Structures are given as structure tokens and as C-alpha cells.
């Protein structure tokens, strides 16, 4: 389910895997979210997530409420890349930089920016909240 209310996008997700990142003390969390594949970098010392956990992702222009059980950061939408070489349509990769930590949103159907009404260089908050 993808909800979009006043520049706030809410995705229901399940964590598929947590992999070692390419830098020391960095992990990459991979999730399936309502037709999107979302991955984000997280520093090992603040990683509070586990595989198969159900979470909610919020991408918002306004600072959302959060608790110590959530991961939240803010940064900018850097780019959206389109790969038309796939046999079954277009693949879009949207990249958000949280001042160094990266968030990648991959869609095999349509542009995430177009469906969410966001633009490159928009300042956004990215939160991953545990379903309690």
C-alpha cells in the first residue's frame, strides 16, 4: 500500500536482507515495499532492524514524528535514472542522499518521482519505523 498525503509518502515494507556495505561499519538494508524495492545504508552501531521485520517507510517534505525505535534522516533527492534496456519495460532508480548515506528506490513500472509528485533536489525526510 502506498499512501501519499500532502507530500508525505507512506510505504508498507518487509526487510528482505541486511548485507555488509562496501565501507567499514556500514550495512545495507534491502526491503520490498508495495511494488518498489528500497535499500538504504545504515551505520552498524545504530542498526535496529532485522531480516523479515515488517516496517513502514515515510518519505516526507515535513519532519515526521519518530521514536528511538525508528531510523530517520534528512537529505536531498539527488537523481532518478531510467533504464530502458530491460525486456519488460522501464526500470527507474531514484537516489536520495542523507548527507552521505544513500537510499535507493527501484521501480519496474513507473517513475517514483512522478507518482509521488516529488522533484530532484527536494529536501526530504526518510524514516523507517517499526510496526509495533
UniProtKB/Swiss-Prot annotation:
GO terms for cellular component: cytoplasm; DNA-directed RNA polymerase complex. GO terms for biological process: DNA-templated transcription. It is found in: Cytoplasm. Gene3D superfamilies: Nucleic acid-binding proteins. Transmembrane segments: none annotated. One of its GO terms (molecular function) is DNA-directed RNA polymerase activity. InterPro entries: NA-bd_OB-fold, RNA_pol_Rpo8. The keyword Nucleotidyltransferase applies. It catalyses: RNA(n) + a ribonucleoside 5'-triphosphate = RNA(n+1) + diphosphate. Its EC number is 2.7.7.6. It is an enzyme of class 2 (transferase). The keyword Nucleotidyltransferase applies. It holds the Pfam family RNA_pol_RpbG. Keywords: Cytoplasm, DNA-directed RNA polymerase, Nucleotidyltransferase, Transcription, Transferase. Part of the 13-subunit RNA polymerase complex. Belongs to the archaeal Rpo8 RNA polymerase subunit family. DNA-dependent RNA polymerase (RNAP) catalyzes the transcription of DNA into RNA using the four ribonucleoside triphosphates as substrates. This is DNA-directed RNA polymerase subunit Rpo8. It comes from Saccharolobus solfataricus (strain ATCC 35092 / DSM 1617 / JCM 11322 / P2) (Sulfolobus solfataricus). The gene is rpo8.
Amino acid at each position: 500500500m502506498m499512501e501519499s498525503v500532502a507530500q508525505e509518502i507512506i510505504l508498507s515494507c518487509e526487510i528482505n536482507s541486511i548485507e555488509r556495505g562496501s565501507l567499514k561499519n556500514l550495512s545495507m538494508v534491502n526491503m520490498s515495499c508495495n511494488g518498489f524495492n528500497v535499500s538504504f545504508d545504515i551505520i552498524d552501531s545504530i542498526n535496529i532492524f532485522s531480516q523479515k521485520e515488517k516496517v513502514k517507510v515515510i518519505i516526507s517534505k515535513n519532519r515526521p514524528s519518530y521514536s528511538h525505535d525508528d531510523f530517520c534522516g534528512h537529505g536531498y533527492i539527488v537523481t532518478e535514472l531510467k533504464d530502458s534496456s530491460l525486456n519488460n519495460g522501464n526500470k527507474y532508480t531514484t537516489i536520495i542522499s542523507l548527507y552521505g548515506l544513500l537510499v535507493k528506490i527501484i521501480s519496474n513500472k513507473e517513475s517514483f518521482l512522478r507518482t509521488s509528485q516529488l522533484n530532484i533536489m527536494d529536501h526530504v525526510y526518510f524514516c523507517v519505523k517499526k510496526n509495533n
